[in-house]
């Protein structure tokens, strides 16, 4: 197969591993910095130009699109789709997953367990907002936050109110969420490929920290998932239309709750923690679904 990895940095662990896994299986693989491509949008012979070279006839694409490059990145993925390539994640699913609020709404509609969540931009009724999610303690999140920054635990109603007022003063969009205390600062990253969880790890926040992000000093370990956790992760990825996804779960007293879903999940933490060849699993998935003549993606834009 001819495979394109769309990545801004060939040196990143995830990019290197995907290239290596494709080469080990004798595929013709090219890493393409999608930010430097340009496209010809025409119905007859659409194409992508990169480094003066016309990119054509790719069987499969692996998008590794960072959050800050979503707009142009998904446009390039879409162009490869228009040309008939099978993408490990469709442009549409990537765009959808980048909006945290939209993602929660889609998951809720499918009946997937979520922490009770309220959303607000500029409400005057802060007391009501806090009460809708069950009252303090609550977790308050900036919609644009990442790596745990912009996620606050407010232990009392008064603290929650002050934090919400402060964010409102900054004109920020926020989520207010039921605090899942029984998760005890841990979450579970399920790596989904196709309709399977191929690897999973438990992340534990540093001492006294409720956020489990590795960027905030958390550490990761192998974990055994319950059948319910597995099926929740698979159903969540499917609801989002993602073929490759990192689904983060909280273990609550009433079962697994989906916290968020990532469409370009990193490979380093999960491979090093579990010893699973996740990159290989992604290439295998493409082999099964993107074989020449099998690229039957019929995407509605
Ligand atoms: N409702 C909650 N109850 C308990 N703990 C939570 C809750 N929401 C978040 N956390 C903890 O805080 C951490 C960070 O929250 P979250 O993953 O929502 O934001 P983020 O990590 O900043 O976003 P991203 O993963 O996109 O970078 C989670 O990994 C989890 O450990
Ligand atoms: Mg997170
Ligand atoms: Mg996220």
Curated annotation (Swiss-Prot):
Superkingdom of origin organism: Bacteria
GO biological process: protein modification process; SOS response; translation
InterPro entries: ATP-grasp (IPR011761), ATP-grasp_RimK-type (IPR013651), ATP_grasp_subdomain_1 (IPR013815), RimK (IPR023533), Rimk_N (IPR041107), Rp_bS6_RimK/Lys_biosynth_LsyX (IPR004666)
GO molecular function annotation: ATP binding; metal ion binding; ribosomal S6-glutamic acid ligase activity
Positions of Mg(2+) 2 binding: 260, 262
Keywords, in A-Z order: ATP-binding, Ligase, Magnesium, Manganese, Metal-binding, Nucleotide-binding, Protein biosynthesis
Binding site for Mn(2+) 1: 248, 260
Cofactors that this protein relies on: Mg(2+); Mn(2+)
One GO location term (cellular component): cytoplasm
Protein name, entry field: Probable alpha-L-glutamate ligase
Organism from which the protein derives: Picosynechococcus sp. (strain ATCC 27264 / PCC 7002 / PR-6) (Agmenellum quadruplicatum)
Gene name, Swiss-Prot/TrEMBL: rimK
